[in-house]
Amino acid sequence: MEPISHLVKSSLPNYLSSLPVPDSLGGWFKLSFKDWLALIPPTAVLAGLGYTAYLAFCPAAQCSAKSARCNNHIRKHEAKVVDMIDVEDIAEKAAFCRCWKTKNWPYCDGSHGEHNKLTGDNVGPVVVSKKK
């Protein structure tokens, strides 16, 4: 407990009192390069605390359940989208969509390509083929 007490009662107040914080607005323009470097650590700590508080308490920073959806337009009236495709009906091979962006559900039409370019993602189709 003694190191924490020393930090709070002695080290931290000494550090804060030694910071080159000017008394007036014009004083900020008279700070040297070394003074600006000394102000970086406390500024970074305050920015980190502010950002953490923003993420914790601001509703706009939290993800909503609606934006977490992967299916935005395919058969939304159904509770669960399920397609049964008989393997015997596949001629040589078939590409099935995994990204929910296709207009030709359940088959892939390459809509994931634009999504991959925009987001840097690597999603692709599931390709099912017959053994030869």
Curated annotation (Swiss-Prot):
It holds the Pfam family zf-CDGSH. Keywords: 2Fe-2S, Endoplasmic reticulum, Iron, Iron-sulfur, Membrane, Metal-binding, Transmembrane, Transmembrane helix. Its cofactor is [2Fe-2S] cluster. One of its GO terms (cellular component) is endoplasmic reticulum membrane. Residues 1-35 are lumenal. Gene3D superfamilies: CDGSH iron-sulfur domain, mitoNEET-type. Belongs to the CISD protein family. CISD2 subfamily. This is CDGSH iron-sulfur domain-containing protein 2 homolog. The gene is Cisd2.
